[in-house]
Amino acid sequence: MKTDDFDYKLPEELIASYPLENRDASRLLKLNKQTGEIADYKFTDFIDFINPGDLLVFNNSKVMLARLYGSKTTGAKLEYLIERIKNPKLFETHIKANRSPAIGSEIYVESTHAKVLDKDGGMYLLEIQGDKDIYQLMEEFGHIPLPPYMKRDDEEFDAERYQTVYAQDLGSVAAPTAGLHFSKELMQQIKDKGVDIAYITLHVGSGTFKPVQVDDVESHKMHAEVISVPVEVCQKIRQTKENGGRVIAIGTTSVRSLETAGQNGQIEPYQGETDIFLYPGKKFNVVDAMITNFHLPKSTLIMLVSAFADKEKIIKAYEHAIAERYRFFSYGDAMFIF
């Protein structure tokens, strides 16, 4: 299976650099994965596609203000993208610099002193030596780490709009974007309809934006992300399945978390890392339907939806979305695949 099979041509003007005024004002492309039938709706119509007894599973991870700036002791400028926090003074980060800082060197994160303890590929392990910890630095100086394809600096409204309304557990470098469409009003309508809701956590890493760079899909090494699928979520899923309801994952992060926890055919609580890679030929044991945004060409995420719905059907749906001028990527429109 070739990576190029998952390529498509996207007019640049369809990349959504800014959110719509209202979260739930997006469009929703409905795709029947059995028949390939495609239909155009508003996102608020989603309430009509779910039934009492269904279970929606959301990722409650919160985006960190992960972009920070600083310098070397020489004054040379540094830009940080915090990837993972080990403890309040120890964290992994990407560093953009004219010349990479050496292991053992002392640098500044904003105006706070830090030491480079280790480097693995493009990832640095830093320890803060000053009084402030990384959480305080992010709170005081941090920026929302918008995806590179938006080609703009973050603005004040992004701090709210690049978070889901139910975000709780701090740790992501990127938003679980399928959830961005859900307003507080829509969440209430879902509850009022008798549809059950559950929350898992997957802290999205920066690897989510990386295109697959090997020719053969199966050779790709997936990045690892931290997930939590609690026992009560597993109980809800088992109950839903027993009663004939559907498990509907909100976003590919929820899909990957649930399928990690259900890899043995039975959903079990899971806490730890996952590097699960779902591509055509892989089996889904837990998820019956999903809400997802439109994904980058040749990405692991377009491979995931192609595994769920069949590659030809996905490519046709994407061609339809382009012809109908849907908005793409993080601040773009969504699909309901069932």
From Swiss-Prot:
Keyword Repeat annotated: no
Species in which this protein is naturally found: Francisella tularensis subsp. mediasiatica (strain FSC147)
This protein's name: S-adenosylmethionine:tRNA ribosyltransferase-isomerase
UniProt-listed Enzyme Commission number(s): 2.4.99.17
Pfam family, one: Queuosine_synth
An individual GO BP term: tRNA wobble guanine modification
Pathway terms, separated by semicolons: tRNA modification; tRNA-queuosine biosynthesis
Keyword set, alphabetical order: Cytoplasm, Queuosine biosynthesis, S-adenosyl-L-methionine, Transferase
GO molecular function: S-adenosylmethionine:tRNA ribosyltransferase-isomerase activity
Superkingdom classification of source: Bacteria
Similarity section: Belongs to the QueA family.
Reactions listed under catalytic activity: 7-aminomethyl-7-carbaguanosine(34) in tRNA + S-adenosyl-L-methionine = epoxyqueuosine(34) in tRNA + adenine + L-methionine + 2 H(+)
Subcellular location: Cytoplasm
Keyword S-adenosyl-L-methionine (UniProt): yes
Quaternary structure (record): Monomer.
Function description: Transfers and isomerizes the ribose moiety from AdoMet to the 7-aminomethyl group of 7-deazaguanine (preQ1-tRNA) to give epoxyqueuosine (oQ-tRNA).
Location (main, coarse): cytoplasm
Membrane-spanning ranges: none
